[in-house]
């Protein structure tokens, strides 16, 4: 079966003025996709790739192949809106499982739930990683504004070094086409790939790995918080004394805003 849905509509006349687009909503009213609409007179067909946005993952020299693809949308009825300037025309698309699928609805639902769990873990790890690199880079920027032998510059570099070492435990950082380096990021992405390629019930061995990876991720976040809590207040006080910008930690709101339309 195809992974794309074809949305077909007829226009009596070619649309010339004003905006025109197609919006797809799930049963809860969440916008799932916005598609460019054909404007020519007669029958128009628009393809909806029934996948959601790929998960955001921490940057690394290692390509996160499986994370280049988002999950398939769940089975169900989706509302399609053709927005033509100030007019809106509504229809529906029904997404169903392959009738020949050997997997039960319960097994497919568990696969979707597990896949989304790993999707969210990749997104959370991406935020943790960027929080670490943001604080590290800010510390290094401040250190560069001081004499390299200045005590504060040395402490800032040490602070940045601790954060960098922590980051190396969660993300592969070695440069090269094939390094074989595998850290937390790579293990989560790999598991996401396995589950996304099989629409049936995940095996118990696969399911048992998820809480282990989640514990590693939260441990990394706790270490980051501990480093910050033990050093940042004192560093910021000394930065203020030298009339340098203090190090402000990246917030989730700032992070989400940065990637809102990406």
Predicted segments with their positions:
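Glycine-centered tight-turn motifs at strand-turn-strand junctions
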Residues: 31-69
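Mature extracytoplasmic or organellar-lumen-exposed domains after removal of signal/transit peptides
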Residues: 77, 93, 124-262
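Surface-exposed, short loops/turns at beta-strand junctions within beta-sandwich domains
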Residues: 70-74
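Extended low-complexity, serine/threonine- and proline-enriched intrinsically disordered segments
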Residues: 17-36, 82
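Hydrophobic beta-strand positions in extracellular immunoglobulin-like domains
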Residues: 9-11, 50, 95
């Amino acid at each position: 079966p195809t992974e794309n849905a074809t949305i077909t509509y007829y226009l009596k006349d070619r649309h010339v003025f004003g905006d025109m687009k197609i919006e797809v909503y799930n049963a809860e009213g969440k916008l799932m996709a916005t598609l460019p609409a054909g404007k020519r007179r007669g029958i128009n067909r628009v393809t909806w790739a029934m996948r959601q946005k790929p998960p955001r993952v921490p940057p690394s020299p290692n390509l996160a192949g499986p994370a280049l693809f988002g999950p398939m949308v769940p089975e169900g009825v989706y509302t399609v809106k053709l927005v033509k300037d100030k007019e809106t025309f509504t229809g529906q698309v029904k997404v169903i499982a392959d009738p020949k699928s050997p997997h039960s609805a319960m097994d497919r639902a568990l696969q979707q739930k597990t896949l989304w769990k790993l999707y969210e873990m990749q997104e959370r790890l991406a935020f943790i990683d960027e929080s670490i690199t943001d604080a590290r880079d800010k510390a290094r920027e401040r250190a560069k504004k001081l004499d390299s032998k200045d005590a504060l510059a040395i402490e800032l570099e040490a602070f940045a070094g601790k954060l960098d070492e922590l980051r190396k435990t969660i993300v592969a950082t070695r440069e090269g086409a094939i390094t074989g380096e595998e850290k937390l990021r790579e293990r989560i992405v790999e598991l996401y790939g396995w589950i996304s390629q099989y629409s049936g019930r995940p095996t118990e061995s696969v399911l048992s790995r998820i809480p282990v990876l989640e514990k590693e991720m939260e441990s990394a976040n706790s270490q980051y918080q501990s480093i910050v809590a033990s050093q940042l207040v004192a560093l910021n006080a000394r930065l203020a004394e030298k009339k340098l910008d203090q190090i402000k930690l990246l917030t989730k709101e700032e992070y989400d805003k940065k990637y809102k339309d990406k």
